[in-house]
From Swiss-Prot:
Belongs to the major facilitator superfamily. SotB (TC 2.A.1.2) family. The gene is sotB. Keywords: Cell inner membrane, Cell membrane, Membrane, Sugar transport, Transmembrane, Transmembrane helix, Transport. It comes from the Bacteria. Involved in the efflux of sugars. The physiological role may be the reduction of the intracellular concentration of toxic sugars or sugar metabolites. InterPro entries: MFS, MFS_dom, MFS_Efflux_Transporters, MFS_trans_sf, Sugar_effux_transptr_put. This is Probable sugar efflux transporter. HAMAP family: MFS_SotB (MF_00517). GO terms for cellular component: plasma membrane. The lineage of its organism: Bacteria, Pseudomonadati, Pseudomonadota, Gammaproteobacteria, Pseudomonadales.
Amino acid sequence: MDSTSETRSGSWLSVIALALAAFIFNTTEFVPVGLLSDIGHSFEMPTSQVGLMLTIYAWVVSLASLPMMLLTRNIERRKLLVGVFLLFIASHVLSGLAWSFQVLMLSRIGIAFAHAVFWAITASLAVRVAPPGQQAKALGLLATGTTLAMVLGIPLGRVVGEALGWRTTFMAIAGLSVLTLLYLARSLPLLPSQNSGSLRSLPMLFRRPALVCLYVLTVVVISAQFTAYSYIEPFAKQVARMSGEATTLLLLLFGGAGIFGSILFSRYSEAFPRGFLLAAILALGSSLALLLPLSAQPTWLMALSLLWGMSIMCFGLAQQSRVLRLASDATDVAMALFSGLYNVGIGAGALLGSVVSERMGLASIGNVGAALALAGLLLALFAALRYAEALKSTSL
């Protein structure tokens, strides 16, 4: 093998390692969804209160994403990535050892700070270390790692938690992170900071009403999603009366459907720009509205999870693509804002789901989420009509 081939092979291995890191980071954000009941049992707390872990985590990420990106913009990227992983690993060890819910929350805040920095720099790192002309494939691999977190990471985390205890799940994530860190530290070249953006980009972005509308739409629809999804594990067990194994399968089907959602996006989003996004929101709202009616039939509920998983993946990819194109001159800052606002939606949805669970009962989480999705659909229709020219100019 000549030196060029060796370099290219090494570059791809670095990209794959970054994709594995993406898998790990996305798994840990949502793995509590499959462990709420077990964590609540350990600390003698109701799942509605344990679910606030998701809210606090998401809001820390949302508040930290842009400031952390700006604070670290001059740090060499390999060194920064090592620091992020060390914080991530230490926080997971603390999660595994947590002797109180307060300590567990403190550890999750540490993980959230690491998450905020990781996603501010990883896409650009994957592009920079990819072989020449293979940047799009590198981003595709990164997206695959993210998708697999929903397909495999969360169900596997639940399986480990069910068999060995939820603390073991967090310790296993720490162990896998150590191995990933060792490889990345050895394989990545020195990567000086480039094109990291600045605060000067913010006023320019907020003077683009179509972009602002997309940001608001993201918060509304993601809030709808996580009003129900945050509590799907206790819903499946307490309302649908599903076994632990069936609940794990439900999560697996939901995550696996995301793969088909990404295929639908790649095939149809450009051909049907307006209709694709509207259809995704409509399918999401319908899935949430049918959650309670179909809960009496576990087979139908599992079938519904496929539509649900595809629709939220289609929505997320469509929104990300639109933001990138509407802010092609300030992508780092625009995507940091998108990531932050996406997490605002996660936190708001998890908080609303907690309130609904306590005051109206777990059975109502789907209906409340569906009402929010309807508001999102109306907003998307407004954007499609009001900002038709701006969206058309982005080929979306």
